[in-house]
Amino acid sequence: MSKASGKRLNQYVKDYVVFDLETTGLSPETDEIIEISGIKVRKGTVIEEFTTLVNPSRPIPYSATRINGITNEMVENAPLLKHALNDFLTFIGDDILVGHNIHNFDLNFLRNGACRELGQSIQNDYVDTLSLAKICLPQLPRHRLTDLAEHFHIETKGAHRALNDCVMNQLCYEKLGLLLENAKENTAPGQALPTCPKCGNVLLKRNGKFGAFWGCSSFPSCRYTKNA
């Protein structure tokens, strides 16, 4: 069975499922999924959540538990991957998938598991917010999910548990979407995104008391403005 995938989209979409996995390690060939979570979004509003632990049928290494906090005792009575994946694929349907670093990590685990356990391929189109963040916020020294959350003043408590990461990722994606839409409306085709000369963040065009102006997207940490 082919592991063929959908297209990667560097854009904002209004309807999507943001998802995240926790695993026993970094290799989709030799490591296992131990948690799957997803949040279904319609027109920017969360309408449904999915989350489950997964029994990997092998001990979870301490190196994984140290990162995500998931222990062997927690997954002892959890569903096996075959059943968890079947439920998750039903949840996502043919929605566009959104996640952070999913192009290189999560989707490889998902495709490998679906092929091995269910004989299915996952062909949903997807948006990787890591790629999108590098386009929208090139000035950031790092583009981890927690880096984006801190940049946008979004709570990072509970990071590295799948559902918490989904919540954080969804909020960050909506912020990135605002940057993209603003840039699309206020720059000519092929023109670079306008950036703040003080901190390097993208400038957003806003309407103020005295008319339109450009303001830094990192407000209130940076209060740079200029006339539009």
What are these regions (language model features)?
Residues 208-213, 227-228:
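Short cysteine/histidine-rich zinc-coordinating motifs and their immediately flanking basic loops
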